[in-house]
Design a protein with these regions (language model features):
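Residues forming the flavin
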Residues: 10-368
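Single conserved hydrophobic/aromatic residue that forms the stacking wall/gate
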Residues: 1-9, 13
Length: 368
């Protein structure tokens, strides 16, 4: 990997280093692995990869940048000419159960509007069209931003999906429907097409979640402990989420979430003593350790989603290991009760909810 060394305004250089494994003891982890965009192989009907002038939103962003390959001028990749007619396809993969992505990628509507405005500002006599399913502009001043693109910059919005894109006589033929006009067919001859591809979880997110023992949803985005009350916390104590690793997010929401995670970490470190839930799992220790009912099968250790089950060796006075039993780490246990259900010898209980305690409560109710 590469590292940047030096000071701003002074000499700076990039130095290559080989990958290495670093082991550190930390008090908290903030997961900020971000997200990726859908592989364009998922929609061959759009012709990406087959036709050079069909690009993704990220590629268009680079074209429009002053530091990009064309110094900010919008030019076609095929011949370097300025496109006079451009089509933006929103929801390219998003909200499409057939592609396995039924969710909304959230950011596509806004950056597509921005890209269309940039095109109109740079190519004054050009025409821009946006195919969309619904305009989801849910942030502060987002709706006004989209209205400005339509009313002031003259971007043409067409409500409907694109069915097919192909090339004919040097033009890209975009075929779709306008659902606001009774699903009437629409055909546009474009010089360039930009696909607003869906946001998906990073490759390896599922493997990372399993290693860190944090939950994830069916789309491999990391799951928060509670969507309303604990949006930056995970079910594993000390591990927090920030940014688009949890779901596709824009910059303001990512910054707000990162600030919340930082506050949670600072609050954790400012405490002299860590506060934990009292209702945690405990292994039966009513008998002398040697006669513990735990048989050491460790099915509970395999089942525990928080890696809170450890192995404890019971030794005699000479240090000889007599038995290995399960032990619950109270700092990691979240009291979910999974280990209780898996324990064949019934050696684990939730503190405060043992069989004897629950039985006593039931008998007290019956007697009354």
């Amino acid at each position: 990997y590469e590292i940047l060394i030096g000071l701003v305004g002074s000499e700076m250089c990039i130095r290559d280093r080989e990958d290495r494994i670093i082991s550190e003891n930390v008090g908290a982890i903030v997961v900020t692995t971000g997200f990726n965009v859908l592989n364009t192989d998922f929609f061959p009907e759009y012709g990406y990869g087959k036709y050079k002038d069909i690009i993704t939103g990220i590629q268009f962003e680079r074209l429009a940048s002053a530091s990009g390959p064309t110094l900010g001028e919008i030019r076609r990749p095929s011949d370097g000419k300025i496109p006079q007619k451009i089509v933006f396809v929103a929801c390219a993969g998003s909200r499409d159960p057939a592609k396995g992505i039924p969710y909304c990628s959230k950011i596509c509507c806004m950056y597509t509007a921005k890209h269309a405005m940039l095109y109109q500002h740079k190519v004054h006599n050009g025409e821009s069209y946006v195919f969309y399913m619904d305009i989801r502009a849910g942030g502060k001043n987002y709706e006004e931003f989209v209205r400005r693109a339509i009313e002031e910059d003259g971007v043409n919005y067409i409500r409907g999906r694109v069915a097919r894109i192909y090339e004919k006589n040097g033009k890209l033929i975009v075929k779709g429907v306008d659902t606001l006009l009774g699903a009437s067919p629409v055909e546009i001859e474009a010089d360039m097409v930009v696909l607003a591809t869906a946001g998906v979880a990073n490759k390896g997110a599922e493997d990372l979640a399993q290693k860190m023992h944090i939950s994830y949803d069916p789309y491999q985005f990391f799951a928060e402990a509670h969507p309303k009350l604990k949006p930056v916390e995970t079910n594993t104590a000390g591990i927090f989420l920030a940014g688009a690793c949890q779901a596709p997010k824009d910059i303001p929401e990512t910054v707000g979430m990162a600030s919340g995670a930082a506050v949670k970490v600072a609050s954790l470190f400012s405490q002299a003593n860590l506060v934990r839930e009292p209702m945690i799992a405990v292994v039966n220790r009513t008998a002398p350790p040697l006669f513990s009912t735990c048989v050491g099968c460790f099915m509970c250790q395999t089942a525990c989603p928080y890696q809170a089950i450890e192995r404890e060796e019971i030794k005699d006075r000479t240090g000889k290991v007599l038995k290995t039993v399960a032990k619950v780490n109270p700092g990691l246990c979240q009291g979910c009760g999974t280990c209780v259900a898996f324990c064949r010898s019934k050696s684990i209980d939730i503190q405060g909810y043992s069989n004897e305690q629950v039985y006593a409560e039931v008998m007290a109710l019956l007697n009354n």
